[in-house]
Design a protein with these regions (language model features):
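Outer-envelope beta-barrel architecture signal
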Residues: 36-44, 53, 63-65, 105-111, ...
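Residues that act as N-cap/strand-start positions at coil-to-secondary-structure junctions
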Residues: 38-40, 51, 91, 132, ...
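Cleavable N-terminal export/targeting peptides
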Residues: 1-30, 225-230
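Short glycine/proline- and aromatic-enriched beta-strand/turn motifs that initiate or cap beta-hairpins
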Residues: 22-81, 223
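Intrinsically disordered, low-complexity coil segments
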Residues: 10-16, 52-54, 78-86
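Short hydrophobic/aromatic segments of transmembrane alpha-helices and their interfaces
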Residues: 7, 48-49, 218
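Outer-membrane beta-barrel transmembrane domain signature
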Residues: 116-230
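Gram-negative (and chloroplast) outer-membrane scaffold detector with strong preference
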Residues: 59, 64-155
Length: 230
Protein backbone atom coordinates (compact mmCIF):
# COMPACT_ATOMS: atom_id res chain seq x y z
CA UNK A 1 0.00 0.00 0.00
CA UNK A 2 2.84 2.35 0.89
CA UNK A 3 4.66 1.56 -2.36
CA UNK A 4 1.52 2.36 -4.37
CA UNK A 5 1.30 5.74 -2.67
CA UNK A 6 4.93 6.47 -3.53
CA UNK A 7 4.31 5.52 -7.15
CA UNK A 8 1.32 7.89 -7.35
CA UNK A 9 3.33 10.73 -5.82
CA UNK A 10 6.19 10.05 -8.22
CA UNK A 11 3.90 10.09 -11.25
CA UNK A 12 2.27 13.35 -10.18
CA UNK A 13 5.65 14.93 -9.49
CA UNK A 14 6.88 13.91 -12.94
CA UNK A 15 3.78 15.32 -14.64
CA UNK A 16 4.12 18.56 -12.70
CA UNK A 17 7.80 18.86 -13.65
CA UNK A 18 6.99 18.42 -17.34
CA UNK A 19 4.17 20.95 -17.25
CA UNK A 20 6.15 23.59 -15.40
CA UNK A 21 8.99 23.40 -17.92
CA UNK A 22 6.96 25.53 -20.36
CA UNK A 23 6.80 29.29 -19.75
CA UNK A 24 3.70 31.15 -20.94
CA UNK A 25 1.68 34.30 -20.34
CA UNK A 26 -1.47 32.50 -19.21
CA UNK A 27 -1.21 29.60 -16.80
CA UNK A 28 -4.75 28.34 -16.07
CA UNK A 29 -5.25 27.92 -12.34
CA UNK A 30 -7.14 25.14 -10.63
CA UNK A 31 -10.72 26.31 -9.89
CA UNK A 32 -11.99 26.82 -6.35
CA UNK A 33 -14.62 24.07 -5.96
CA UNK A 34 -16.05 24.23 -2.41
CA UNK A 35 -19.13 21.96 -2.86
CA UNK A 36 -20.74 23.66 0.15
CA UNK A 37 -23.71 22.36 2.09
CA UNK A 38 -24.86 25.05 4.55
CA UNK A 39 -24.50 28.63 5.71
CA UNK A 40 -21.62 29.73 7.96
CA UNK A 41 -19.35 27.13 6.34
CA UNK A 42 -15.63 27.88 5.88
CA UNK A 43 -13.23 25.97 3.64
CA UNK A 44 -9.45 26.33 3.26
CA UNK A 45 -7.15 24.55 0.83
CA UNK A 46 -3.44 24.47 -0.06
CA UNK A 47 -1.90 22.85 -3.11
CA UNK A 48 1.17 22.49 -5.32
CA UNK A 49 1.12 21.75 -9.02
CA UNK A 50 1.68 22.99 -12.54
CA UNK A 51 0.90 26.60 -11.55
CA UNK A 52 3.16 26.46 -8.51
CA UNK A 53 1.88 26.91 -4.99
CA UNK A 54 -1.79 27.68 -4.49
CA UNK A 55 -4.20 28.68 -1.74
CA UNK A 56 -8.01 28.54 -1.78
CA UNK A 57 -10.57 30.08 0.56
CA UNK A 58 -14.38 29.79 0.49
CA UNK A 59 -17.04 31.03 2.89
CA UNK A 60 -20.84 30.87 2.92
CA UNK A 61 -22.47 33.69 4.95
CA UNK A 62 -25.90 32.20 4.25
CA UNK A 63 -27.19 29.04 2.63
CA UNK A 64 -27.11 29.34 -1.19
CA UNK A 65 -24.47 32.14 -1.17
CA UNK A 66 -20.74 31.43 -1.54
CA UNK A 67 -17.74 33.79 -1.58
CA UNK A 68 -14.38 32.53 -2.83
CA UNK A 69 -10.79 33.73 -3.16
CA UNK A 70 -7.68 31.95 -4.34
CA UNK A 71 -4.22 32.59 -5.75
CA UNK A 72 -1.14 30.96 -7.23
CA UNK A 73 2.55 31.77 -7.40
CA UNK A 74 5.15 30.04 -9.54
CA UNK A 75 8.78 30.84 -10.36
CA UNK A 76 11.82 29.33 -12.07
CA UNK A 77 15.16 30.23 -10.51
CA UNK A 78 18.56 30.11 -12.17
CA UNK A 79 21.15 28.50 -9.94
CA UNK A 80 18.81 26.26 -7.93
CA UNK A 81 15.82 26.47 -5.63
CA UNK A 82 17.43 28.92 -3.20
CA UNK A 83 18.73 31.34 -5.82
CA UNK A 84 17.21 34.83 -6.05
CA UNK A 85 18.01 35.06 -9.78
CA UNK A 86 14.60 34.33 -11.31
CA UNK A 87 14.31 33.57 -15.01
CA UNK A 88 10.50 33.34 -14.90
CA UNK A 89 7.78 34.29 -12.42
CA UNK A 90 4.00 34.02 -12.52
CA UNK A 91 1.58 35.47 -9.95
CA UNK A 92 -2.22 35.32 -10.06
CA UNK A 93 -5.14 36.01 -7.71
CA UNK A 94 -8.91 35.99 -8.07
CA UNK A 95 -12.14 36.47 -6.15
CA UNK A 96 -15.63 35.25 -6.92
CA UNK A 97 -19.13 34.76 -5.64
CA UNK A 98 -22.21 32.83 -6.61
CA UNK A 99 -24.97 30.37 -5.87
CA UNK A 100 -24.93 26.81 -4.54
CA UNK A 101 -27.57 24.31 -3.49
CA UNK A 102 -27.95 20.80 -2.14
CA UNK A 103 -29.78 18.79 -4.79
CA UNK A 104 -30.19 16.02 -2.23
CA UNK A 105 -28.24 14.64 0.73
CA UNK A 106 -24.99 14.26 -1.22
CA UNK A 107 -25.38 15.87 -4.65
CA UNK A 108 -24.36 19.50 -5.09
CA UNK A 109 -24.67 22.19 -7.73
CA UNK A 110 -22.91 25.54 -7.69
CA UNK A 111 -22.41 28.38 -10.16
CA UNK A 112 -19.67 30.90 -9.42
CA UNK A 113 -18.38 33.92 -11.32
CA UNK A 114 -15.46 36.19 -10.61
CA UNK A 115 -12.53 38.37 -11.60
CA UNK A 116 -8.80 37.67 -11.55
CA UNK A 117 -5.58 39.51 -12.27
CA UNK A 118 -2.04 38.29 -12.80
CA UNK A 119 1.25 38.63 -14.60
CA UNK A 120 4.05 36.58 -16.11
CA UNK A 121 7.60 37.93 -15.95
CA UNK A 122 10.84 36.81 -17.54
CA UNK A 123 14.22 38.54 -17.68
CA UNK A 124 13.05 41.15 -20.20
CA UNK A 125 9.26 41.30 -20.36
CA UNK A 126 6.43 41.58 -17.84
CA UNK A 127 3.03 40.64 -19.28
CA UNK A 128 -0.09 41.67 -17.36
CA UNK A 129 -3.52 40.14 -17.83
CA UNK A 130 -7.03 40.11 -16.38
CA UNK A 131 -9.57 37.32 -16.36
CA UNK A 132 -13.34 37.05 -16.06
CA UNK A 133 -14.65 33.56 -15.41
CA UNK A 134 -17.86 31.58 -14.96
CA UNK A 135 -17.72 28.09 -13.47
CA UNK A 136 -20.67 25.79 -12.88
CA UNK A 137 -19.92 22.64 -10.90
CA UNK A 138 -21.84 19.40 -10.64
CA UNK A 139 -20.61 17.34 -7.71
CA UNK A 140 -20.93 14.87 -4.89
CA UNK A 141 -19.93 15.60 -1.28
CA UNK A 142 -19.89 12.95 1.44
CA UNK A 143 -18.10 12.16 4.70
CA UNK A 144 -15.20 10.34 2.98
CA UNK A 145 -15.21 11.28 -0.70
CA UNK A 146 -15.91 14.42 -2.76
CA UNK A 147 -16.03 14.67 -6.54
CA UNK A 148 -16.82 17.56 -8.87
CA UNK A 149 -16.87 18.35 -12.58
CA UNK A 150 -16.35 22.01 -13.49
CA UNK A 151 -16.57 23.21 -17.13
CA UNK A 152 -15.14 26.70 -16.57
CA UNK A 153 -15.31 29.54 -19.13
CA UNK A 154 -12.51 32.11 -18.88
CA UNK A 155 -12.11 35.38 -20.78
CA UNK A 156 -8.44 36.42 -20.64
CA UNK A 157 -7.21 39.89 -21.64
CA UNK A 158 -3.50 40.69 -22.01
CA UNK A 159 -3.84 44.45 -21.54
CA UNK A 160 -0.25 45.59 -20.96
CA UNK A 161 3.34 44.50 -21.46
CA UNK A 162 6.48 46.04 -19.99
CA UNK A 163 9.66 45.50 -22.00
CA UNK A 164 12.74 46.68 -20.08
CA UNK A 165 10.31 48.65 -17.84
CA UNK A 166 8.84 50.48 -20.85
CA UNK A 167 5.02 50.01 -20.83
CA UNK A 168 3.19 48.94 -23.99
CA UNK A 169 -0.60 48.96 -24.20
CA UNK A 170 -2.00 45.67 -25.48
CA UNK A 171 -5.46 44.40 -26.37
CA UNK A 172 -5.02 40.67 -26.83
CA UNK A 173 -8.11 38.77 -25.67
CA UNK A 174 -9.15 35.13 -25.85
CA UNK A 175 -11.91 32.89 -24.51
CA UNK A 176 -11.03 29.51 -23.01
CA UNK A 177 -13.08 26.43 -22.15
CA UNK A 178 -11.43 24.74 -19.17
CA UNK A 179 -13.04 21.47 -18.00
CA UNK A 180 -11.68 20.32 -14.65
CA UNK A 181 -12.11 17.29 -12.38
CA UNK A 182 -11.79 17.62 -8.60
CA UNK A 183 -11.48 14.64 -6.24
CA UNK A 184 -11.06 14.63 -2.46
CA UNK A 185 -10.71 11.72 -0.06
CA UNK A 186 -10.22 11.61 3.70
CA UNK A 187 -12.31 12.54 6.71
CA UNK A 188 -15.15 14.98 7.24
CA UNK A 189 -12.95 17.94 8.14
CA UNK A 190 -9.67 17.02 6.41
CA UNK A 191 -9.28 15.57 2.93
CA UNK A 192 -6.53 15.16 0.39
CA UNK A 193 -7.35 16.83 -2.91
CA UNK A 194 -6.27 16.38 -6.52
CA UNK A 195 -7.41 18.51 -9.46
CA UNK A 196 -6.68 18.27 -13.15
CA UNK A 197 -8.00 19.93 -16.26
CA UNK A 198 -7.50 21.17 -19.79
CA UNK A 199 -7.63 24.62 -21.39
CA UNK A 200 -9.00 25.01 -24.93
CA UNK A 201 -9.07 28.41 -26.70
CA UNK A 202 -12.42 29.09 -28.38
CA UNK A 203 -10.86 30.78 -31.39
CA UNK A 204 -7.43 32.26 -32.03
CA UNK A 205 -5.03 33.68 -29.44
CA UNK A 206 -2.27 36.29 -29.69
CA UNK A 207 -0.42 35.17 -26.57
CA UNK A 208 1.12 31.99 -25.23
CA UNK A 209 -0.79 29.78 -22.81
CA UNK A 210 -0.56 26.40 -21.12
CA UNK A 211 -3.17 23.87 -22.24
CA UNK A 212 -3.45 21.76 -19.06
CA UNK A 213 -3.08 21.95 -15.30
CA UNK A 214 -2.82 19.58 -12.36
CA UNK A 215 -2.41 20.04 -8.61
CA UNK A 216 -2.52 18.08 -5.36
CA UNK A 217 -2.88 19.21 -1.76
CA UNK A 218 -5.24 19.22 1.20
CA UNK A 219 -8.67 20.65 1.96
CA UNK A 220 -10.15 21.68 5.33
CA UNK A 221 -13.85 22.20 6.11
CA UNK A 222 -15.19 24.04 9.16
CA UNK A 223 -18.94 23.90 9.94
CA UNK A 224 -21.10 23.97 13.06
CA UNK A 225 -21.67 20.22 12.86
CA UNK A 226 -21.52 17.38 10.38
CA UNK A 227 -25.06 16.06 10.77
CA UNK A 228 -25.58 16.94 7.09
CA UNK A 229 -23.41 13.94 6.14
CA UNK A 230 -25.29 11.36 8.23
Amino acid sequence: MKSRGLVVVGILATITLVLTSCQALYLPNQPNVPLMSEGDELQVGMSVGSTGYGAQLAYSPYYHWAITANGNTFSVNNGGSFSTNRSFQHLYGEAGTGFYTRVNKYLRFEALAGFGSGYSFDTLTKRLYRKLYFQPTFGYSGPVFDFGFTPRLSHVLNYRNKVNDVPQTMNNAAMFLEPCLTARVGYEQFKFQIQGGLSFPLGGTNFTYRNRFISMGFHLTFVKDFEKYK
